[in-house]
From Swiss-Prot:
GO terms for biological process: biomineral tissue development; protein localization to plasma membrane. The gene is WDR72. GO terms for cellular component: cytoplasmic vesicle. Gene3D superfamilies: YVTN repeat-like/Quinoprotein amine dehydrogenase. Plays a major role in formation of tooth enamel. Specifically required during the maturation phase of amelogenesis for normal formation of the enamel matrix and clearance of enamel proteins. May be involved in localization of the calcium transporter SLC24A4 to the ameloblast cell membrane. This is WD repeat-containing protein 72. The modification Phosphoserine is found at S1077, S1079. Keywords: Biomineralization, Cytoplasmic vesicle, Phosphoprotein, Repeat, WD repeat. It comes from Pongo abelii (Sumatran orangutan).
Length: 1098
């Protein structure tokens, strides 16, 4: 699993919808957590002054969130658990926003209680769950596996609500109320052993409460006697000893109660569905206990409520509220009532310690203490919340933002295509658009970045599709767009011409899909158009014709499948029915429902089902947190309805599509528009492109040292002269641009027969392996060098804490990276199904940040402390590799960027690595050789490349310098301290940059800051000398790694090479032969290396 996906959110000026369905305050009273109908969780900062600010959105559920609860002892592990309507459960670390565990069970939970008895239980405790199933489930809080269940001996039923009775005087018990109004009690303390032994555990007591629709049950911990039970139309107070009724209060004015809490002895708080709340004092009635009722029992002392206070609330009966109460156990010991609305608003009331009524006895009104919405964050930080195409689009609505209704990113062309509400389509370079949006000097990027505007639609553009991204056999210039008027246009995006218009005569086109490669009709793949009126149309692009119009579906289309043998189109609908269409004739062959429909769909399950077929990088296919929002408006690309699944060529894409270091994800917030875009930086892939391949990772079945020698062989074939540059120091590292130059990777190895031939004047190499019948070569991978290095610089610009000190100018001068316009919203893909994004103004409640670092791109105050600890661990001689005084500044700049990215990857991998694995990896790295007095930059980067390969592949064969062992231990410890990945990365980056800038004080620097206009030309001029350095480093790699059989004196070269030396170098690929040795994978070495290596051989 790739864990190096960093993200930057470009939100736009309108906040995404967040319809609150669940709310809680964490035990440390520093954070509010809300779950939404859209499936996302939101973390809100809560200050000691009870000020609120939205901090982070967590993407992990594909359905509406039903409940939230703590999942650990919060003082030890800040974990909470969330449950969704479709049975998904996630355990989150709310400190760093990462999902630590996820499971999907066939249960819909409506309430969860955490229980742990330290002296009787092992593990992390239990999650006691109730919902739309019988009785109570017991789920392991760590693994989310079902451990056992509490069963009912009589009248098993669904459970509406529950609470845990925990007291030092009595045993722990679980109290529940069923949908039929049955109160049941299970003993927890005495049931632990029985549950661990999988024995049935039944209730010890039950009582019918004579009311329905129970909302809340609460035990009074102050008196350990009263029991509050809130129903929708009344609330009651019982004596916990024998469950006798003490009080009944019926709702008035048509209000429906939603919950309640015991806030003090004989004092309760009740709230309603429309957000009103009331505080009552329970008073004794004064009835004598000597009065006996007719049945002979002793009459219990009865009580009656006295209304003390009520809370002020805006009258809005159309917005249901979810509410809760928190009694702070830490200073300043606030009692807080909180609510969340479907509109996304959070409101807090500070409940006084001693609520009192007015002098005339009427209830006193408690004012609202704080209220906040996501939009408030966006309004206060409008510069942070700009859209990615604001600089390029002249299309503005009243709010000043581009009205984008659909969006598509083409990684192979680095083009972002945005369809707008007025029918125009904007095409721009995505990386340039991101730089213009985020970096200072964006106007220069805007002026130098061409963009196109396509005009052809008369209605809003609702869907886009780039067919070549799904099948390389289709024309690279084709693009499809659909609109509200049921018109689909085939474009040539290079010439901006309209090739054809398809008029479907149906509803708005909500999704454009493509058949898999195995399904072809008339020699070509088919385009499937799904419309909002439940109709489906098939288009033949080559023939410019519409093959099928299927209009008889009664429910929204949920699934599209293809039958390649009989040319059938299989359409699955939301009611689980199936329609089978014959494509050639356009007739409906069959219509099935129920079990037959499920069988038909399962029989066609031979290819991958996905939510969307839009061409995105494979890592974004793995991180499906945004694609798979089945019941929410958060979807990647326009989908026809929640949960649409199509059988497509994405299985083929997964095999053919190579991950790229930079991607753009459009995220839908409504069916008709794109709310924001996410920039994805694949740190692992970026390091792969920039670091040299470690020699230990070279497959013996491949040609000599892979792609670099292939390139050299090609240059020999083309009769290009190879030159070596004279240098006093050891050969330097590969430059970033040179390494990122487009090359073709060798085919995938394994049990296949791999042959490589490069023929010129008899030059031929061949390596044979075990023969296999099936051969699936790895796809060719071409990466633009300038795009790679620009991506690396933009990534570093986004992470550097600009404005912390006076090093900004030095970073711009020596690293040639531009400063950010302001703080940005960072994010992280923590798991294959989970994603977290910071919101604009996430640090509003952090008074220290506002006071000391206002407007600084500092992730948290903790970053500076972590950076100091990291710097203290660094030995004096360890830092960014130097020794490049004789090289041009552009090469030093590239080497520094390579080194910084490799360090960031190391940090990212270690922080995400499990502790036991990190310890095992750390113990496997030991000192293998004595450091030279003068450290070579090439050796540093090769060491990092070797260690990177170990972390990526899980091997323990590589070695790092001893100095890195202490850093490895330090970074591994950060995981246990709930340090966020972005915090750790920013801290290490800042420490390394500071070390580098300090070292530059001893090195003469002749470079000047490069302007944006000169940046591109400068990088192009640097390519040629860096290619020469690549040759030099390759020979240095051989010298450092492969010991010679016989000592050979170094050969000195003049700057003017004679013809004999040139001929030797031209013939060198012919001599780069790995002969079979007695030890598998161990090459024999030849003395010819010394003839071409300008460095001293030791």
């Amino acid at each position: 699993m790739r864990t190096s996906l960093q993200a930057v959110a470009l939100w736009g000026q309108k906040a995404p919808p967040h319809s609150i369905t669940a709310i809680m305050i964490t035990d440390d009273q520093r954070m509010i957590v809300t779950g939404s109908q859209e499936g996302q969780l939101c973390l809100w900062n809560l200050s000691h002054e009870l000020k609120i600010s939205a901090k982070e959105l967590l993407f992990g559920h594909s359905a509406s969130v039903t409940c939230l609860a703590r999942a650990r002892d919060f003082s030890k592990q800040p974990y909470i658990v969330s449950a969704a309507e479709n049975g998904e459960m996630c355990v989150w670390n709310v400190t760093n926003g990462q999902c630590v565990e996820k499971a999907t069970l066939p249960y819909r939970h409506t309430a969860i209680c955490y229980y742990h008895c330290s002296f009787r239980m092992t593990g992390e405790g239990w999650l006691l769950c109730c919902g739309e199933y019988q009785d109570v489930l017991i789920i392991d809080a760590k693994t989310l596996a079902v451990v056992h269940s509490f069963r009912s001996s009589q009248f098993p039923d669904w459970i509406n609500c529950m609470c845990i009775v925990h007291s030092m005087r009595i045993q722990d018990s679980l109290l529940v109320v069923s949908v039929a109004g049955e109160l049941k009690v299970w003993d927890l303390s005495s049931s632990i052993n029985s549950i661990q032994e999988k024995q049935d555990v039944y209730e010890k007591e039950s009582k019918f409460l004579e009311s329905l629709n129970c909302q809340t049950i609460r035990f009074c911990t102050y008196t350990e006697r009263l029991l509050l039970v809130v129903f929708s139309k009344c609330w009651k107070v019982y004596d916990y000893c024998d469950f006798s009724l003490l009080l009944t209060e019926v709702s008035r004015n048509g209000q429906f109660f939603a919950g309640g809490e015991v806030i003090a002895a004989h004092r309760i708080l009740i709230w309603t569905e429309d957000g009103h709340s009331y505080i009552y004092q329970l008073l004794n009635s004064g009835l004598s206990k000597s009065i006996y009722p007719a049945d002979g029992r002793v009459l219990k002392e009865t009580i009656y409520p006295h209304l003390l206070c009520s809370t002020s609330v805006q009258e809005n009966k159309n917005r249901p509220f979810v509410m809760g109460y928190m009694n702070e156990r830490k200073e300043p010991f606030y009692k807080v009532l909180f609510s969340g609305e479907v509109s996304g608003r959070i409101t807090l009331w500070h409940i006084p310690d001693v609520p009192v009524s007015k002098f005339d006895g009427s209830p006193r009104e408690i004012p609202v203490t704080a209220t906040w919405t996501l939009q408030d964050n966006f309004d206060k930080h409008d510069t942070v919340s700009q859209s990615i195409i604001d600089y390029f689009s002249g299309l503005k609505d009243g709010a000043g933002t581009a009205v984008v209704t659909s969006s598509e990113y083409i990684p192979s062309l680095d083009k972002l295509i945005c369809g707008c509400e007025d029918g125009t389509i904007i095409i721009t370079q995505a990386l340039n658009a991101a730089k213009a949006r985020l970096l200072e000097g964006g106007s220069l990027v805007k002026d130098s970045s061409p963009h196109k505007v396509l005009k052809g639609h008369h209605q809003s553009v609702t869907s886009l599709l780039y067919p070549h991204g799904l099948s390389s056999k289709l024309d690279q210039s084709w693009m499809l767009s659909g609109d509200l008027d049921s018109c689909v246009i085939l474009w040539d995006i290079f010439t901006e011409e309209i090739l054809h218009k398809f008029f479907l005569e149906a509803g708005p086109v909500t999704s454009l899909l493509m058949s898999p490669e195995k399904f072809k009709l008339r020699g070509a793949q088919i385009i499937c158009c799904v419309c909002s009126d439940h109709s489906v149309a098939l288009l033949h692009l080559e023939g410019r014709s519409c093959l099928l119009r299927a209009r008889k579906h009664l429910f929204p289309v949920k699934m599209i499948k293809w039958h390649p043998v009989e040319n059938f189109l299989i359409v699955g609908c939301a009611d689980d029915s199936v329609y089978i269409w014959e494509i050639e004739t356009g007739t409906l062959e069959r219509h099935e429902t129920g079990e037959r429909a499920r069988i038909i769909l399962n029989c066609c399950d031979d290819s991958q089902l996905v939510k969307s077929v839009f061409p995105i990088a494979s890592e974004t296919l793995k991180h499906k947190s945004i694609e798979q929002r089945s019941s929410s408006p958060y979807q990647l690309g326009p989908l026809p309805c929640p949960g649409l699944q199509v059988e497509s060529s994405c299985k083929v894409i997964d095999a053919k599509f190579c991950p790229r270091p930079f991607n753009v994800l459009p995220v839908k917030t409504k069916w008709s528009n794109v709310g924001f875009h996410i920039l994805l930086f694949d740190l692992e892939n970026l390091v792969e492109l920039l670091l040299p391949t470690p020699l230990s990772d070279v497959d013996s079945s491949s040609s000599f040292y892979g792609g670099e020698v292939l390139r050299r062989a090609k240059s020999t074939v083309e009769k290009k002269t190879l030159t070596l540059r004279k240098s006093k120091t050891a050969c330097g590292p590969l430059s970033a641009e040179a390494l990122a130059k487009p090359i073709t990777e060798s085919p995938a190895q394994g049990d296949n027969t791999i042959k490589f031939s490069a023929e010129n004047d008899g030059i031929k190499r061949q390596k044979k392996m075990k023969i296999s019948k099936k051969m699936q070569p790895k796809p060719s991978r071409k990466v633009d060098a300038s795009l790679t290095i620009d991506t690396a610089k933009l990534f570093l610009s986004c992470l550097l804490p600009w404005g912390v000190d006076d090093l900004d100018y030095l970073c711009i001068k020596h690293l040639n990276i531009l400063k950010l316009q302001g703080p940005i919203s960072l994010g992280f893909a923590s798991n294959e199904d989970n994603f977290s994004l910071m919101l604009p103004g996430w640090d509003l409640c952090n008074t220290e940040m506002i006071k000391d670092y206002s407007g600084v791109n500092l992730f948290s105050r903790k970053v500076l402390d972590l950076s100091d600890k990291y710097t203290a661990t660094l030995p004096n001689q360890v830092g960014i590799p130097r020794g490049l005084e004789n090289n041009c500044d552009s090469l030093q700049e590239s080497d520094t960027i390579v080194y910084l990215l490799s360090r960031l990857f190391l940090v990212n991998k270690l922080v995400n690595m499990p502790l036991e694995l990190a310890c095992r990896v750390g113990s496997s790295f030991r000192m293998e050789c004595v450091h030279n007095k003068v450290r070579s930059a090439g050796n540093d980067i090769l060491n990092m490349s070797s260690f990177y390969s170990c972390l990526r592949n899980g091997k323990n064969e590589s070695h790092v310098p001893e100095a890195d062992l202490s850093l490895l231990k330090l970074i591994s410890c950060w995981r246990d301290q709930s340090v966020q990945v972005t915090e750790a990365i920013q801290a290490v980056l800042w420490a390394e940059v500071q070390q580098h800038m300090k070292s530059l004080g001893k090195i003469p620097v002749n470079s000047q800051p490069v302007s944006m206009a000169e940046n591109g030309n400068c990088e192009m001029k640097q390519m040629l000398p860096k290619l020469e350095w690549t040759e030099e480093l390759e020979l240095q790699c051989i010298r450092n790694t492969l010991p010679l059989q016989t000592p050979v004196s170094p050969v000195k070269h003049d700057s003017n090479l004679n013809s004999a030396n040139i001929q030797d170098m031209e013939d060198m690929p012919d001599r780069c032969v790995l002969e079979e040795s007695e030890s598998p994978g161990e090459p024999r070495h030849h003395s010819w290396i010394a003839k071409v290596c300008p460095c001293k051989v030791s």
